[in-house]
């Protein structure tokens, strides 16, 4: 158990797991803008873009720390820990099996992870969340003719028949269920058929059941244990609205004493703590505010082994059940009652008494899954049922004619009733859990004897390729420990490429959900052929197994086949915790997954019994090879593909036959891959190769597949062929492959003549002498429909769908489309972007939808027949809109003394796509500002802007980096640090648009995600920044209020512009908003907002300065960049004035000059830029100035800071003398030379304690004093007539000299001394009951001391002792011990006062 678990913060990210709600609420038009879509994009660095964005969010929110999962390179774990600690990171936990660390780190330090060579990858410790149950629409059911049972779902996969025929029921197999926990005393999860205990292990890797029992007490008076202590208890994770993070709420509870009666602890010491209701109402009293006393005792003298929980909150343990650790004693107790008992266990107890962990299933999901895997009731009637109904499809409709509102607990028989369960809680009672908890649970199960790990959890994100942390863990644990992972595909279907993580793991058996036939209620009308009858009638919707509409479809983003198989997952009846009621129906791939876990248990059970060799690869292969292909709907002719079902419905008897057939043979291993450049998503992949072809947006003509055979013969003959005619291998038929040698198979994809649609096929590589197919390459291509002038840029479909069947429509959205509009005549549909992510979660109903600025590429519209009657019909329409205005730059040139305030400009509106009947809305004028900025690799550029009231649109764009191939990301935050918009594409050309932003201050942030020179070294790039704020202030009027245009038609419009006579010259922004009447009425979305730019009299400059930092007193070259603000082209021959010097820009619009900063922290450089036809610009640049690296020897050593080239200044000599005793006067005399009448600046460092600093000399123009962390700096400006002599005098206390090394050692030692003393006193203060206000004050000084000490650690690279001579350590070490001393003094005083009262 990780005792540090309660310090972890989670990033709250919604992830899929079980079953989604598929419907948008009625009455709300669905509208989406692709500008506001969060992108999680590719990375080839340690820090992913997701982590970078989270770090930036934390910085903007003022969050001090964030928590990451970091994977280290093999054998580099300790080195990585050392390097991370040098950054000031805290190692919260470690997983040595997977070389992973859980790390708390300051967000501003995250970028430095990219430069630690021992690290591989960093991920967020994301929060995983189960989804709510599916709710069907318009489906009614009749009363059941038979009591509900699981047998139909186990029968359809041949599990019951397999057990009856072969006798292997899962005995000897352990299945770990990673979920919300399992009811430890459920009647169907109590024993196996041969009487063995069903649940053999119960572990909790969440924080839910954790109790801090580090408090020990020994004073017992008449059976009463004296506590008299105030406890601070972390009561649970709660969303902090200000930071957006899940954080623990710490509550204070005082306990005076508890009754223990005759309960004894062998060593006389009792450990005590409080169990809070973190996520579950344990006593069902309507709140989660209770704290349950917990008592640990050492019953034998061999360590703490027994726990008591005061479940009735009477502070009396004598009426409670003693619990030993479950996997030792198998003790179970009842916490409380609801519909039935809430059973719980002691999952873990620390032998030293420091903590205890309790377990229960407060959600129900885990118990349902466990029942499906291995539920068993000794009174079950499975065999009677099987003999009565086996082989009759109609029985399923009778069985599934349930009434959801009147379910009674009946027999539950799991797929593998003889298997034993390892209950691993990784999700809390609220259905949430952290990614680290899940990985820890996976590791524990793999290393503690699990044969199968069943994971009905997961979530989706763009571009999942199996490189996320959970998937990496799945693959590594499979390789290292031979455990079989069975994982849910997810419930975000039926769009393609939507399988979630960790289901995308290569080694996982990923499971989709099938639906067995059920009875449904359908309103019968004349249209269905019943002229005399109306109303709901019940009959089977279909008679063969289908794929559940919600099941996530493949392929994986790199083309790999996912899911691998399907199993029943719709309306599954299984066990639920007894407190809920014992059993019920649930749907989802979460329910399908345990069916396959049970099948794997059956196969392994038989293999163990018969001595058949197996491993995870073999089990996966025989499952796939034995699966039953599901054809689809015979009435509509709709068919399923590998994307829907993988290899088909699991069939345990067929897989068993194959497993036996290959026993004793050596199967050849065949692998394949192709370069990722063939993929549409190459730039987003975290891997270098693809495992299949997923041609979503473009189809390669030829792909070169690399094939490699490894086996027990030098050569082997394989048959290579394609399952579809459009896949044409250049080599087909028999091919002889050489062992351990790559063979390149060229394949042509002949798509000419294919109708629009989705095409899926495989390339088979098969040794016909074996009972399995050795290898296969999945190929998925999309042939989209096109918007054309002939179809008025409108596509329509009228479809007939069978129940649980899916219709896919793909269409291409070209570049430059303003709005994508979609609608249906009746049934719901899904809309998916070209990257595979849904636009609206999850289904759209009859309300029209609009997507502004849609992502270019091939979109998918998909709809399903749900569980409705055969041949349901619906029509769909999609349309694109796009308009352009020419010219889009308008010029107004006023003449001298012109009094005119009205100006007219003609422009053309051209309708590019679908016909429009539109209203024109002019908006303007507004501001237009352009500048040239800079950002370094991994750094952030931040600029504040103020958005005024009445702003109709805020548009920000960046681009044109000086370093080619830079990847810059653009973010916009509000004044509270909330992310408003982002563009995170893998380029430097980014744009965000916010319509009608709230007035206030915003921050523009540009992240230099990857800025590398041609050699791959980190560097700095400049970029253009344009900020436009368009205000609706009535400056623009049009001569037309509305227009009607067909495709490619134009109209001339006159804009009448009103400006004041004294309106400043420059560049301004405006918008012509075009509202198609139908689209706007349906969705409240304009079909276009065309930006226009108005230039009044003169243009503006856009200027930038690079670099943006410097060191005090150190001269360096700076470059001023001058561009045209509108075109962003360089402006040559512009006059630039900096100080007293004048320059001309070169052909690149740049001026390079030398400058040395003379102010610490921030210095200013003011420039004036002039040119004809441009407004004169005066701008002051702020540069960040750091203190120079300085030692004691550098004190009083002057440096030449700044001079003009003409001055040619040099320091001729320096003399220093001092006099006096304790208070010493120091004189520094400097002689410098330079060109007459020119100026120069010098910097003289003096000791930090110097006082009464004076500067004298005939030619001193001015001087100033800057105080740094290590010294003071005298900045002196002189003007030359001849060699100039400058004198600096100051006084300083010169008492007994103590070296820097000694002072640092004293600070270090005193801090550690006081820190140790603080820990002792704080514990004593808690025991004595010191008030919370005093404790909090002491803690604040203690934490401040810790921060200063960590700063010293950071400066010394984690080794203070070796750096004691470093002057930089002096301030933080001094502050560390001073603050720790204050904390100690506060506690000493409080304790003294309380003890004095006694």
From Swiss-Prot:
Swiss-Prot/TrEMBL keywords: Glycoprotein, Hydrolase, Protease, Serine protease, Signal, Zymogen
Pfam families the UniProt entry points to: Peptidase_S8, PPC
Record's comment on post-translational modification: LWM pyrolysin seems to be produced by autoproteolytic activation of HMW pyrolysin.
Gene3D superfamilies attached to this UniProt entry: 2.60.120.380, Peptidase S8/S53 domain
Main location: other
Location(s), subcellular: Cell envelope
Propeptide: 27-149
Organism domain of life: Archaea
Active site as annotated: 179 (charge relay system), 365 (charge relay system), 590 (charge relay system)
Family statement: Belongs to the peptidase S8 family.
Function noted in UniProt: Has endopeptidase activity toward caseins, casein fragments including alpha-S1-casein and synthetic peptides.
UniProt-recorded name of the protein: Pyrolysin
Organism listed in the record: Pyrococcus furiosus (strain ATCC 43587 / DSM 3638 / JCM 8422 / Vc1)
């Amino acid at each position: 158990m990780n005792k540090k678990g309660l310090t972890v913060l989670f990033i709250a990210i919604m992830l899929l797991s079980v079953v989604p709600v598929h419907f948008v609420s009625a009455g709300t038009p669905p509208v989406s803008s692709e500008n506001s879509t969060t992108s999680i994009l590719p990375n080839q660095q340690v820090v992913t873009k997701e982590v970078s964005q989270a770090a930036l969010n934390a910085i903007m929110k003022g969050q001090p720390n964030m928590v990451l999962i970091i994977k280290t390179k093999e054998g580099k774990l300790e080195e990585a820990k050392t390097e991370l600690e040098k950054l000031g990171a805290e190692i919260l936990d470690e997983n040595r099996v997977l070389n992973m660390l859980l790390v708390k780190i300051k967000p501003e330090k995250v970028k430095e992870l990219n430069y630690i060579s021992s690290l591989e990858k960093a991920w967020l410790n994301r929060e995983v969340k189960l989804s709510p149950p599916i709710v069907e629409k318009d489906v009614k059911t009749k009363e059941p003719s038979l009591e509900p049972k699981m047998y139909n779902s186990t029968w359809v996969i041949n599990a019951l028949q397999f057990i009856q025929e072969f006798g292997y029921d899962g005995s000897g197999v352990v299945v770990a269920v990673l979920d919300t926990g399992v009811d430890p005393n459920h009647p169907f999860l109590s024993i196996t058929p041969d009487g063995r205990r069903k649940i053999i292990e119960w572990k909790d890797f969440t924080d839910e059941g954790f109790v801090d029992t580090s408090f020990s007490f020994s004073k017992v008076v008449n059976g009463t244990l004296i506590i008299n202590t105030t406890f601070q208890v972390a009561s649970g994770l709660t969303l902090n609205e200000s930071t957006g993070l899940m954080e623990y709420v710490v509550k204070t509870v005082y306990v005076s004493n508890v009754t223990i009666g005759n309960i004894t602890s062998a060593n006389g010491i009792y450990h005590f703590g409080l169990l809070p209701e973190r996520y579950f109402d344990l006593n069902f009293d309507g709140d989660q505010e209770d704290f349950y006393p917990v008592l640990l005792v050492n019953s034998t003298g061999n360590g703490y082994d027994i726990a008591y929980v005061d479940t009735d909150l009477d502070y009396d343990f004598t009426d409670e059940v003693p619990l030993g650790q479950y996997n030792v004693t198998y003790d179970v107790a009842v916490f409380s009652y609801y519909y039935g008992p809430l059973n719980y266990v002691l999952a873990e107890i620390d032998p030293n008494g420091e903590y205890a962990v309790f377990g229960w299933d407060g959600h129900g999901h885990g118990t349902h899954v466990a029942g499906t895997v291995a539920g068993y009731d000794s009174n079950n009637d499975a065999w009677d049922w099987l003999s009565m109904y086996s082989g009759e499809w109609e029985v399923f409709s009778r069985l599934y004619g349930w009434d959801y509102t009147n379910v009674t607990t009946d027999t539950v028989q799991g797929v593998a009733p003889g298997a034993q369960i390892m209950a691993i809680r990784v999700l809390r009672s609220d259905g949430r859990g952290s990614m680290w908890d899940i990985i820890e649970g996976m590791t524990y199960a793999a290393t503690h004897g699990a044969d199968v790990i069943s994971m009905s959890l997961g979530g989706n994100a763009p571009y999942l390729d199996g490189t996320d942390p959970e998937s990496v863990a799945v693959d590594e644990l499979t390789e290292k420990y031979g455990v079989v992972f069975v994982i849910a595909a997810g419930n975000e279907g039926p769009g393609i490429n939507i399988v979630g993580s960790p289901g995308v793991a290569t080694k996982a058996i990923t499971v989709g959900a099938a639906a067995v036939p059920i009875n449904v209620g359908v309103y019968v009308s004349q249209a269905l052929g019943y002229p005399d009858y109306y109303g709901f009638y019940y009959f089977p919707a279909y008679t063969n197994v289908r794929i559940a509409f919600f099941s996530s479809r493949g392929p994986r983003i790199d083309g790999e086949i996912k899911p691998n198989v399907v199993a029943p997952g719709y309306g599954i009846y299984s066990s639920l915790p007894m407190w809920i009621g014992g059993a019920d129906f649930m749907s989802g791939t979460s329910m399908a997954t345990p069916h396959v876990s049970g099948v794997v248990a059956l196969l392994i059970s038989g293999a163990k019994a018969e001595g058949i060799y197996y491993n995870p690869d073999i089990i996966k292969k025989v499952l796939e090879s034995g699966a039953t292909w599901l054809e689809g709907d015979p009435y509509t002719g709709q068919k399923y593909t590998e994307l829907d079902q993988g290899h088909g419905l699991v069939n345990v008897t067929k897989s068993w036959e194959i497993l036996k057939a290959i026993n004793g043979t050596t199967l050849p291993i065949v692998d394949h891959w192709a370069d990722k450049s063939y993929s549409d998503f190459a730039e987003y992949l975290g891997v270098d190769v693809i495992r299949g072809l997923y041609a979503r947006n473009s189809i390669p003509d030829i792909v070169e597949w690399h094939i490699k055979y490894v086996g027990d013969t030098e050569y082997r003959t394989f048959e290579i062929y394609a399952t579809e005619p459009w896949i044409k291998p250049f080599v087909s038929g028999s091919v002889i492959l050489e062992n351990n040698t790559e063979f390149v198979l060229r394949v042509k994809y002949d798509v000419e003549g294919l109708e629009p649609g989705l095409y899926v096929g495989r390339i088979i590589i098969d040794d016909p002498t074996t009972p399995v197919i050795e290898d296969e390459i999945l190929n998925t291509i999309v042939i989209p429909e096109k918007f054309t002038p002939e179809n008025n840029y409108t596509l329509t479909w009228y479809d007939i769908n069978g129940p649980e069947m899916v219709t896919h429509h793909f269409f291409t959205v070209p570049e430059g489309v303003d709005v994508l509009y979609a609608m249906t005549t009746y049934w719901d549909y899904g809309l998916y972007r070209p990257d595979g992510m849904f636009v609206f979660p999850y289904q759209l109903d009859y309300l029209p939808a609009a997507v502004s600025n849609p992502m270019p590429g091939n979109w998918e519209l998909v709809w399903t027949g749900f569980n409705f009657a055969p041949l349901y019909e619906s029509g769909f329409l999609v349309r694109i809109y796009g308009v352009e205005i020419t010219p889009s730059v308008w010029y107004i040139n006023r003449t001298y003394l012109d009094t005119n305030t009205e100006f007219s400009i003609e422009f053309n509106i051209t309708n590019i796509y679908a016909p429009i009947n539109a209203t024109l809305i002019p908006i303007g004028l507004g501001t237009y500002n352009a500048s040239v900025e800079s950002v370094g690799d991994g750094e952030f550029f931040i600029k504040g802007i103020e958005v005024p009231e009445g702003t109709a649109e805020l548009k920000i764009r960046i681009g044109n980096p000086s370093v080619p191939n830079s990847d810059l990301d653009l973010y916009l935050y509000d004044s509270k640090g909330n992310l408003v918009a982002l563009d995170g594409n893998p380029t430097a050309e980014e744009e965000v648009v916010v319509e009608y932003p709230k007035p206030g201050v915003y921050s523009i942030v540009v992240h230099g995600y990857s800025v590398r020179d041609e050699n791959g070294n980190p560097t700095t790039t400049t970029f253009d920044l344009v900020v436009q704020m368009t205000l609706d202030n009535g400056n623009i009027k049009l001569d037309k209020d509305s227009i009607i245009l067909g495709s490619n038609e134009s109209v001339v419009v006159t804009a009448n512009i009103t400006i004041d006579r004294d309106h400043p010259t420059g560049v301004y922004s405006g918008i012509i908003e075009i509202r198609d009447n139908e689209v706007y009425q349906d969705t409240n979305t304009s079909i276009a907002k065309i930006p226009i730019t108005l230039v009044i009299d003169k243009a503006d400059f856009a200027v930038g300065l690079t670099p943006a930092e410097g060191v005090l007193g150190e001269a360096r070259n700076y470059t001023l960049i001058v561009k045209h603000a509108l075109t962003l082209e360089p402006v040559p021959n512009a006059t630039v004035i900096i100080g007293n010097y004048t320059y001309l820009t070169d052909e690149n619009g740049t001026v390079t000059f030398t400058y040395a900063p003379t102010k610490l922290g921030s210095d200013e450089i003011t420039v004036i830029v002039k040119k004809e036809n441009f407004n004169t610009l005066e701008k002051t640049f702020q540069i960040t100035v750091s203190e120079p690296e300085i030692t004691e020897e550098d004190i009083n050593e002057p440096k030449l800071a700044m001079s003009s080239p003409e001055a040619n200044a040099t320091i001729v000599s320096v003399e220093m003398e001092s006099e006096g005793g304790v208070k010493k006067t120091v004189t520094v005399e400097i002689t410098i030379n330079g060109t007459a009448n020119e100026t120069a600046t010098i910097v003289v460092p003096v000791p930090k304690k110097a006082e009464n600093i004076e500067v004298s000399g005939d030619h001193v123009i001015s001087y100033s004093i800057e105080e740094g962390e290590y010294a003071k700096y005298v900045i002196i400006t002189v003007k030359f007539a001849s060699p100039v002599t400058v004198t600096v005098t100051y006084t300083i206390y010169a008492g007994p000299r103590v070296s820097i090394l000694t002072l640092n050692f004293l600070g270090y030692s005193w801090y550690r001394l006081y820190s140790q003393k603080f820990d002792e006193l704080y514990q004593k203060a808690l025991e004595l009951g010191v008030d919370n206000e005093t404790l909090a004050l002491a803690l604040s000084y203690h934490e401040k001391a810790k921060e200063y000490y960590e700063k010293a650690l950071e400066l010394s690279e984690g080794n203070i002792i070796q750096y004691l001579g470093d002057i930089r350590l002096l301030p933080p070490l001094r502050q560390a011990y001073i603050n720790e001393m204050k904390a100690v003094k506060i506690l000493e005083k409080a304790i003294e006062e309380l003890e004095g009262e006694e």
